[in-house]
């Protein structure tokens, strides 16, 4: 049986006896997701193949033993050692900081209000979500990122930055003021519900969107997140052996490929909108069966004539990449397409506006 694991609730960072810093979260979303996953699996071929587990912290479930970030780290270590765990939905609100007043820690003398003010030192806590796919790159990871009254672009970029740093496969970014929920994918596409925007402007004027619509938009996005997870989480993972060498010169590519690439770049097909200098999209051309030249990962594709490309060799489940950069994430899709459609030898995927 394969496991889909959902972790929810908030954690505490102990300061002194009866005093803690906390990340307030009470498990509602984690419970909802658990029910939604089970509802989606019922009656499908995956129903008997998958088991949904929900782990809640003590803040969300009084019977739980999960209290601190350390407890969540211990839980993750157990989950990562369990090969039946295939998907982790990390909805847990972890304390971003470890709090301390002095070196005596939690078991120091109890603080007394009669002693007046104390200075609290906050130290950034480790980002536990980042450990998941560093240890188990085969796990499908869903993360969550919160913003406060951010613009839609700021919200997207914040969620995207978190996705890239933690290697999440999907991220749900939600804003606590605008109530906007955006699902972000590794291909840097945002999926959102239009229900709030559609109802903000009625009868020729703007109006306040009610709580019921905000709740419906949130539930719609959670359902979409579940559907996208189930559609993507069982895709195969192939580890690539990377050999660092010189890039493949763009000028060695077929003329047709170079002409199309220059056209796409000229039309703004590779948009730098993620705040990190990289561009979404991918491209490549076939050299021979199982051998092709692909775009580079973590670069600006508009500079391909300067940066060059990466050689990729596929032999069964073995993939070897040679160049100055790893190939684009889309290189695996390119390999599958070249194999399925041998009559084609060039692929260009961008975002033409």
What is the predicted function of each stretch?
Residues 1, 279, 287-288, 341-344:
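Short, well-ordered loop/turn elements at secondary-structure boundaries
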Residues 1-227:
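A cross-family phosphate/adenosyl-ligand binding-site feature
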Residues 23, 290-293, 344-348:
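Conserved active-site beta-strand-loop modules that form the wall/rim of enzyme catalytic pockets
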Residues 81-82, 131-135, 162, 284, ...:
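Short, conserved, surface-exposed binding loops centered on an aromatic residue
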Residues 219-329:
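Long, non-catalytic terminal segments
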Residues 314-353:
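Short HxH-centered metal-ligating active-site micro-motif
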Residues 84-85, 168, 230-236, 344:
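Short, high-confidence coil segments that cap the C-terminus of an alpha-helix
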Residues 10-11, 297-298, 352:
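Active-site metal-binding loops of divalent metal-dependent hydrolases
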């Amino acid at each position: 049986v394969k496991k889909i694991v959902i972790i929810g609730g908030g954690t505490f960072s102990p300061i002194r006896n009866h005093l803690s810093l906390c990340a307030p979260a009470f498990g509602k979303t984690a419970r909802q997701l658990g029910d939604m996953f089970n509802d989606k699996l019922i009656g499908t071929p995956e129903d008997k193949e998958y088991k949904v587990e929900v782990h809640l912290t003590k803040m969300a479930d009084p019977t739980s033993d999960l209290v601190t970030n350390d407890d969540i780290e211990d839980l993750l270590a157990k989950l990562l050692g369990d090969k039946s765990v295939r998907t982790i939905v990390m909805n847990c609100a972890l304390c971003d900081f470890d709090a301390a007043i002095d070196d005596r820690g939690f078991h120091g003398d109890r603080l007394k209000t009669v002693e007046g003010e104390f200075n609290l030192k906050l130290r950034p806590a480790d980002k536990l979500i980042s450990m998941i796919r560093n240890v188990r790159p085969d796990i499908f990871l869903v993360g969550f990122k919160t913003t406060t009254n951010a613009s839609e672009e700021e919200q997207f970029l914040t969620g995207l930055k978190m996705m890239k740093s933690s290697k999440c496969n999907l991220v749900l970014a939600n804003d606590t003021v605008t109530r906007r929920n955006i699902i972000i994918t590794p291909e840097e596409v945002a999926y959102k519900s239009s229900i709030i925007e559609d109802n903000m402007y009625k009868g020729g004027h703007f109006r306040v969107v009610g709580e019921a619509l905000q709740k419906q938009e949130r539930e719609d996005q959670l359902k979409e997140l579940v559907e996208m997870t189930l559609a993507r989480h069982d895709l195969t993972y192939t580890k690539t052996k990377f050999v660092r060498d010189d890039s493949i010169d763009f000028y060695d590519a077929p003329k047709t490929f170079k002409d199309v690439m220059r056209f796409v770049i000229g039309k703004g097909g590779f948009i730098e909108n993620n705040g990190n200098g990289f561009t979404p999209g991918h491209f490549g051309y076939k050299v021979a069966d199982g051998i092709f030249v692909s775009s580079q990962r973590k670069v600006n594709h508009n500079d391909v004539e300067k940066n060059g490309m990466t050689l990729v060799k596929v032999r069964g489940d073995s993939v070897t990449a040679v160049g100055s950069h790893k190939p684009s994430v889309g290189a695996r899709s390119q390999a599958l397409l070249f194999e399925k459609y041998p009559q084609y030898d060039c692929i260009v995927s961008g975002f033409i506006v």
